[in-house]
UniProtKB/Swiss-Prot annotation:
Region of interest called PEST, as start-end residue ranges on this chain: 589-747
The record's note on its domains: The nuclear localization signals mediate the localization to the nucleus.
Low complexity composition-biased segments: 692-710
Biased composition (Basic residues): 741-751
Cited function: Substrate recognition component of the SCF(CCNF) E3 ubiquitin-protein ligase complex which mediates the ubiquitination and subsequent proteasomal degradation of target proteins. The SCF(CCNF) E3 ubiquitin-protein ligase complex is an integral component of the ubiquitin proteasome system (UPS) and links proteasome degradation to the cell cycle. Mediates the substrate recognition and the proteasomal degradation of various target proteins during G2 phase involved in the regulation of cell cycle progression and in the maintenance of genome stability.
Name listed for the protein in its UniProt record: Cyclin-F
């Protein structure tokens, strides 16, 4: 470059240095970077224990947790039970409006489960605390019927102070101190008075019944719809005799139904079958009935297996089949059975349940439902005994709390039985057709594939199928089509599937190839005219009558592998027969738990007496009011608990198969059914397999408690039912395999003297 020469700064003469790009650091996003409302929602979805951990992470999180009560109101306490260690956590959540915490605290104090107190004044202290949390529960109960009364209903303990009575008196005193008659306080008073009236109505004392009627009137004046309906029921009998009163009563019922009372809607639908109403009233009622049927929605039960990873359709079938046997043995109504199954399915859709606790869920749901709709209940002590003490008293109490809290107190839901009863009032039905319809309705409980149809459709389909099978000239008359809104064309697919699942396809079998047919056995009773023994029309013939193509291809049997069966169901004794036990033991099970079925010899009695005395004393713990009726005394009951199972000493399955002789020396290896001594004659094992549902059942005669008749009255078994065949499904239980492997199943001789003609039915 020459000196003094100037150059322009164009791109040809001058190359500017390139600009350096400054790399921006990426923004670090953390949980605290979320908007406050989103962060609050995250905290509300956490379990209660994790909320405390999150609170210690950052001051901002601590501020959110402390300043927003909604975090505690929506905190989850799933699988967590109140204890001295977490009591403050539960109480804080309950005060903030957590429904689950209130329910569990109330039950924990009532049954003295988890929150141990000294025996001195325990009933009084626990009762007052349980009353406080039950009152909070009803305050938070917005969408369900008042239900806390089912925990304090009779029987009450007759020895000393009763915690249930303390809760009742405390709630009654609370209602007397309420001064505000409007708003939420008045509604709470109405709900509590309804619960108190329900409890009083279950006593036999006339004075208590009159007091219950007065409480219902007070509750109805505070706006409790359920109390208004119960008052309507009490006045209905007198209104039937006077046309003017009947019309006024009918209009009241229509008003309650329009306000959402389910029982009123069902009663209104049944009333449409009567011709006492004026034509205008009949028309409006028919429209409401049509709305009741059309508003019924299907419950997709197949989603259960999305939540329950280790469960399949056959496992559910086995559970429901066992519940049917329990309901038959205890003579529970079909409505109670349908409610129980519905409660089981709804809970299984919400909460994941280990396979070992499926039976616990089933029996806990039955305890809840019998308390809710039946005068005779299944006590907690008896429910534990029905599972052959596979679970403890406290296990059942806690499961009841889990179910009630998970379902938010919604126990009573529409069932197939409700709609079936309405249909039976709309048109005249002969006895056999009604029994066949009930039979089909209970069979529908076993199959999840039928849940694609609503309960109203299933009830209508069951009635239509029953009338077709009985060759009715007009199986679906115009009156039913108009009232329900279901035409024959709409119901045809449901009818075909009902027939295919209930009559065409084979029932699932256990690993011993024994069909599970508890519903069929239930309807072989003379009470149902042995309707299940009737020959049913072929599936192809039905399809031909309905004008639909016949698909004979049977759906793939949801039958698990043999290994799954061994884990899920042990070898039980069948109906009127002695079946061999499967002696192989799976590693994931402690042992097979079956109903004690053998008597001890004198020598065995002397050797094992001390152990059995200890086991009987320790197996029946918990709240006394659920263990004894008012007439029961200690020493009158022998429960089959803590039994030794020595038959598992032989673990080779081939050894059992080789012992096919009828020699008497083999009797100890194949114990006699518990109540065989109460049956007349002996039954051979040949030709009886098809009559069994696949369970060896506990007998109500040896039951420690029974709620099917009042104390002191002789127990009458269900007609036509072999009471030596019921037995719990032996789900795997957490027991020591080393101890169980050397146990043999025996039953201690009953010390209480009783005869076949007079078995005390104790609670």
């Amino acid at each position: 470059m020459k000196g003094g020469a100037l150059h322009c700064r164009c791109s040809k003469c001058f190359a500017a240095p390139p600009k350096r790009r400054v790399k921006r650091r990426p923004r670090v996003l953390t949980l605290l970077s979320l908007p406050e409302d989103v962060l609050l929602y995250v905290l509300e979805c956490l379990p209660a224990v994790d909320i405390l951990s999150m609170r210690e992470v950052h001051p901002h999180l601590r501020s959110l947790v402390d300043s927003h009560s909604s975090v505690w109101a929506r905190a989850s306490f799933q699988d967590v039970w109140p204890s001295p260690e977490n009591l403050n956590l539960f109480e804080r959540a309950a005060e903030c409006g957590n429904f689950e915490a209130c329910v569990k605290l109330g039950i924990a104090y009532l049954y003295n489960e988890g929150l141990s107190l000294s025996d001195d004044g325990r009933a009084e202290v626990n009762g007052l605390k349980a009353s406080r949390f039950f009152s909070l529960t009803e305050r938070l109960n917005s969408g369900a019927d008042p239900f806390v009364w089912l925990f304090i209903r009779p029987p009450w303990s007759s020895s000393g102070s009763c915690c249930k009575a303390v809760v009742f008196d405390s709630l009654k005193e609370e209602c007397g101190t309420v001064t505000s008659e409007e708003g939420a306080t008045g509604a709470l008073k109405g709900s509590i008075q309804y619960c108190l009236a329900k409890v009083l109505s279950l006593f036999e004392d006339d004075d208590k019944k009159r007091e219950a009627l007065g409480m219902l009137e007070s509750s109805a004046s505070h706006g409790c719809l359920h109390s208004s309906y119960l008052l309507w029921e009490t006045k209905q009998k007198t209104a039937l005799s006077d046309p003017g009163r009947y019309l006024q009563s009918f209009r009241q019922l229509r008003d309650y139904a329009a306000r959402g009372c389910w029982d009123a809607q069902i009663s209104l639908a049944k009333a449409c079958g009567h011709k006492n109403q004026l034509s205008q009233e009949q028309r409006s009622a028919s429209e409401l009935v049509n709305q009741v049927f059309q508003s019924s929605l299907p419950i997709n039960k197949t989603s259960i297996f999305t939540t329950q990873k280790g469960m399949n359709d056959t496992m559910r079938y086995i559970l429901i089949d066992w519940l049917v046997e329990v309901a038959t043995m205890k003579d529970f109504s079909s409505l109670c059975l349908h409610m129980t199954v519905g409660l089981v399915d709804r809970y299984l859709k919400l909460r994941s349940v280990p396979r070992a606790k499926l039976q616990l869920v089933g029996i806990a749901c039955m305890v809840i439902c019998t308390r809710f709709i039946s005068k005779e209940i299944l006590t907690i002590r008896e429910a534990v005994w029905l599972t052959d003490n596979t679970y403890k008293y406290e296990d059942l109490v806690r499961m009841m709390g889990e179910i009630i809290s998970a379902l938010e107190g919604k126990i009573r839901m529409p069932t197939v039985v409700d709609y079936k009863d309405v249909l039976s009032h709309l048109i005249p039905l002969d006895r056999s057709t009604l029994h066949l319809c009930s039979y089909i309705s209970e069979l529908s409980l076993l199959y999840t594939e039928l849940s694609t149809y609503s309960p109203a459709q299933l009830a209508a389909g069951a009635l239509l199928l029953a009338r077709i099978l009985h060759k009715q000239a007009r199986p679906w008359p115009a009156q039913l089509a108009e009232t329900t809104g279901f035409t024959l064309e709409h119901l045809t697919p449901c009818v075909v599937l009902l027939h295919k699942k209930c009559f065409h396809d084979d029932a699932p079998k256990d690993y011993r190839q024994v069909s599970l047919t508890a519903v069929k056995q239930r309807f072989q009773d003379d009470l149902y005219d042995q309707i299940s023994k009737e020959k049913v029309m072929d599936h192809s013939h039905l399809c031909e009558l309905l004008g639909v193509p016949c698909r004979d291809s049977e759906s793939p049997a949801s039958c698990p592998n043999a290994a799954d069966f061994h884990q899920f169901l042990c070898s039980p004794s069948g109906s009127k027969t002695k079946r061999r036990r499967e002696d192989s033991i799976q590693e994931d099970r402690g042992s097979f738990v079956t109903t004690p079925t053998a008597e001890l010899s004198n020598q065995e009695e002397d050797l094992l007496g001390d152990f059995l005395d200890w086991s009987l004393e320790t197996s029946c713990s918990g709240y006394e009011g659920d263990r004894e009726s008012e007439g029961e005394r200690e020493g009158e009951v022998t429960a089959p608990s803590g039994v030794l199972d020595l038959s598992l000493l032989i673990t080779e399955h081939q050894q059992c198969q080789d012992t096919t002789s009828d020699d008497d020396s083999l009797v100890p290896l194949h114990p006699i059914p518990l109540l065989s001594k109460l049956e007349n004659g002996t039954h051979s094992t040949e030709g009886c397999a098809e009559k069994s549902s696949g369970y060896s059942s506990v007998s109500s005669g040896g039951s420690p408690t029974s709620s099917s008749s009042p104390p002191g009255l002789p127990f009458t078994p269900t007609p036509g039912l072999n009471h030596s065949k019921l037995m719990p499904i032996p789900f795997p239980q957490p027991c020591s395999p080393l101890f169980k492997a050397s146990r043999r199943q025996v039953k201690r001789k009953n010390q209480a003297q009783h005869s076949e003609d007079n078995l005390s039915d104790e609670l």
